[in-house]
Design a protein with these regions (language model features):
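Phosphate-binding/switch region of NTP-binding enzymes
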Residues: 86-87, 92, 96-97, 190, ...
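The Walker A/P-loop phosphate-binding site
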Residues: 49-142, 149
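Amphipathic, non-transmembrane alpha-helical secondary structure
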Residues: 100, 104, 108, 173-184, ...
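Amphipathic alpha-helical transducer elements in NTP-driven molecular machines
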Residues: 12, 72, 132, 136, ...
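Short, small/acidic-rich helices and loops at N termini and domain boundaries
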Residues: 1-52
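Short, conserved phosphate-binding/catalytic loop or strand-edge motifs used
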Residues: 19-24, 193-202, 236
Length: 316
């Protein structure tokens, strides 16, 4: 229609203005990385004018008649492809070792907590805080068990680690580009990242909610592009006046609403050395995580289900 033609031309003029303004900046003193950020922000702000029905819109009757397939399990009964899982615990509880065990075991086709055989997947472990010797200690322990278990079928280079204890900033174009190159190379089905607070930099006077929204948008775009399931390790806020800590994500409340599963790991008063697996919010998906993680003789963590993996247990 004539109105659509006018709208398209107006949209084109706005894009041309943004590009002209950005060309002037390119001749200035802006760092190339900063220039990319500026241009991306400006182009994102230019609203498009839809001229056709969205391809993913349909009548509910037609939509219900279409086949809808659940994504495959990347960790049987615990996590499907594309899911977002946030694990919250106090410092030193053992969540880093747990996520390390998940990444290493899943890469060799071993269930991380009941240690049964399962289809192997490529994994990426992004550690932004722990010292190398701590990672090496548990990494060698788990890897030796997996090598003995798999023998000649051990999948070398199936699990990658990005160890950057200085942290990174997912809102920084250079850091994001590094991650994109790594994801392109590894093609992981599972990414374990933590701790979350070291994956971005909040500048002075920046709002927690706005920062969280931007970081979540980056993570969602990467998930959609590369098709991985994401496990984030996060800290809980400090308790008031020495009181018991609420096991909810530190910082923005968006971290409570964003994940498909929000899990907690809390020290078990009745079982010293064990962690009770709980939840800080209702989940959008159904999965079967252990009810408790117990310290193992060989494996760092061994999962406990009161009714067994297929019996009655903690069914989120």
């Amino acid at each position: 229609t004539y109105a659509e033609i006018v709208g398209r031309h107006a949209h084109t003029r706005r894009v041309m203005n943004v590009l002209a303004e950005s060309l002037e900046d390119a001749y200035g003193t802006l760092d190339p990385g900063a220039l990319v950020e500026v241009v991306t922000t400006r182009l994102t702000a230019v609203e498009g004018v839809p001229v056709e029905l969205p391809l993913d819109a349909d009548s509910i009757d037609e939509w219900l008649l279409q086949p809808h397939h659940e994504p495959p399990w990347v960790i049987p009964r615990m996590m499907r492809q594309g899911w977002r899982v946030v694990i919250v615990a106090a410092e030193g509880a053992g969540k880093s070792v747990a996520t390390r065990q998940i990444a290493l075991c899943a890469a060799q086709g071993v269930h991380p907590f009941d240690h049964s055989d399962c289809p192997p997947v490529n994994t990426l472990l992004i550690d932004l805080e722990n010292p190398g010797e701590a990672i090496k200690d548990t990494g060698e322990r788990i890897t030796s068990l997996l090598r003995a278990r798999r023998g000649n079928d051990y999948r070398a280079n199936a699990c990658w680690i990005w160890h950057r204890p200085s942290g990174l900033d997912l809102r920084n174009r250079r850091h994001r580009a590094e991650l994109e190159v790594l994801l392109e190379h590894v093609r992981p089905q599972v990414v374990c990242l933590g701790p979350l607070y070291r994956a971005f930099t909040r500048r002075s006077r920046e709002d927690h909610e706005a920062v969280a929204e931007q970081v979540q948008r980056v993570l969602d775009q990467l998930r959609a592009r590369f098709g991985f399931g994401l496990i984030l390790e996060h800290h809980a806020p400090k308790g008031l006046s020495g009181g018991k800590r609420d096991l909810v994500p530190f910082g923005s409340s968006l971290w409570q609403r964003w994940p498909d599963m929000g899990l907690t790991l809390e020290r078990d008063d009745d079982q010293p050395g064990s962690l009770v697996v709980g939840q800080y919010r209702g989940h959008r998906v159904r999965a079967r995580w252990p009810e408790r993680l117990d310290r193992g003789v060989g494996w760092p963590w061994v999962g406990f289900w009161s009714g067994g993996m297929t019996g009655v247990g903690l069914d989120f």
